Amino acid sequence: MASTRNPSVVVYHAPGCHLCERALAQVRALRAELGFELREVDISGDPALEAAHREWLPVVEIDGRRRFTYHLQLDAFRRAVAQAAALE
């Protein structure tokens, strides 16, 4: 029988980014249902994070892999989290 685990989801965001606010709200709403660990990272003031993510915000990573930028597709997000949870 395959075991499941709690995937790690990271959302990179910045103040004043309306797409970020929407993605954060969506991810927060799905957290309890899908059982993932959530880390929210404000990139403002960190030159390395700004260089890596500013033009793509929001950026959503699942288990360290960039999966979504700009808009979060809810069905695809659910599938990606479920796939990550099934990995051993």
Set out the residue ranges of the language-model regions:
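Local sequence-structure signature of Cys/Sec-based thiol-disulfide redox active-site neighborhoods
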Residues: A2-A29
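A short, Lys/Arg-enriched amphipathic alpha-helix followed by its capping loop at the start of a domain
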Residues: L30-L34
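Small/polar loops that bind or transfer phosphate-bearing groups
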Residues: Y12, V41, T69
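Non-catalytic, surface beta->alpha helical segment in thiol-disulfide oxidoreductase systems
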Residues: I62-E88
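Short glycine-biased active-site loop of nucleotidyltransferases that positions the nucleotide triphosphate
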Residues: E50-A52
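Thiol-based oxidoreductase modules, predominantly thioredoxin-like and allied folds used
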Residues: F36-P47
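Structural micro-motif
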Residues: R54-V60
